[in-house]
Amino acid sequence: MTKTRILNPTRFPSPKPLRGCGDANFMEQLLLHCATAIDSNDAALTHQILWVLNNIAPPDGDSTQRLTSAFLRALLSRAVSKTPTLSSTISFLPQADELHRFSVVELAAFVDLTPWHRFGFIAANAAILTAVEGYSTVHIVDLSLTHCMQIPTLIDAMASRLNKPPPLLKLTVVSSSDHFPPFINISYEELGSKLVNFATTRNITMEFTIVPSTYSDGFSSLLQQLRIYPSSFNEALVVNCHMMLRYIPEEPLTSSSSSLRTVFLKQLRSLNPRIVTLIEEDVDLTSENLVNRLKSAFNYFWIPFDTTDTFMSEQRRWYEAEISWKIENVVAKEGAERVERTETKRRWIERMREAEFGGVRVKEDAVADVKAMLEEHAVGWGMKKEDDDESLVLTWKGHSVVFATVWVPI
């Protein structure tokens, strides 16, 4: 790496883009070198690289610069946590934007900004509608990151598309003391009341149940609740997993035991659900090696930063603050605090098959609905069907972003 002369490595000047140094590959290499220096306790090299990064990656620059700035903040946070005295020697500590707490209306609009979540909503809802046709009771366990934002559209579809809407719709959600974005500014009790009232306007009777349960123990209390109160006659149990299972620890508890992630899926299979929908981001963030994890994250999180250039400034700030939170969690945290442990589509498919689930092909009408939705968004968004594993994949400029899969017990 070319040496950079630093007059005072402990004082960071205001960011100024350096000519010829703004390309993503250069920034990625600097970030990787910085991560290595931090974990090697090389304070001098850490200071040097942080200084360069600060100069080429202003937090209000282009998408690549903003992405790099987010990783810079994460590396600073990791460096300070490893060496607390370091904070007193660095005069510039860039602050991330505060995470916004959404109203229900704001969150619904926020989710609609990109297909990131809408893609999974549409694919999952279509599969659910097909699976529950003819059942008198539909019980949906919604393990979703988006606070039930998928459910109103599903209720609408049940009321309008099914030959005979179910006399009773039961919705179960988990409420935990553990939090990760997006945040909402109302309680789940209030949210449930709104959903029940909305279902009533569509002539559907709905029950809303909150189960205190946490990802950190594999949602054990939720599974216990479902075992205690099994499905009644002609009741379809649906488990909708939308970007939530990533938080269940994937590391084995002991050298001879399975991970909580594996245990959860096997216990879920024992409940014999009618259908399980699994929507996740297609990236591996589980490596114990920081450099490998950072490289994987950098080559994935450029996508959400690249998609926000057409957003209004406030929307972009909210959106990128959430991505920055993820980046900091992936880079700066370890152990139980590092909760962003997403796995690739391939690994999730292996897990589901090991738990004795079989994949179901997404119907053509769902594919058509996804295509119609994508036409409402920027031209970079696309979709591909993977015939070998029966999945749908959301893409940005040809790169895999989110996958949608549908599963039944075998």
UniProtKB/Swiss-Prot annotation:
Chief localization: nucleus
Statement: the UniProt record of this protein carries the keyword Nucleus: yes
One CC-aspect GO term: nucleus
UniProt note on tissues of expression: Expressed in seedlings, leaves and flowers.
Entry's Gene Ontology molecular function annotations: DNA-binding transcription factor activity
Stretches the record annotates as PFYRE: 237-329
Chain residue ranges for the region called Leucine repeat I (LRI): 25-88
Entry's Gene Ontology BP terms: regulation of DNA-templated transcription
Leucine repeat II (LRII): annotated segments: 190-227
Localization per record: Nucleus
Keywords associated with the record: Nucleus, Transcription, Transcription regulation
Motif (VHIID): 138-142
Family in the record: Belongs to the GRAS family.
Biological role: Probable transcription factor involved in plant development.
Name used for this protein in its record: Scarecrow-like protein 32
Organism of origin: Arabidopsis thaliana
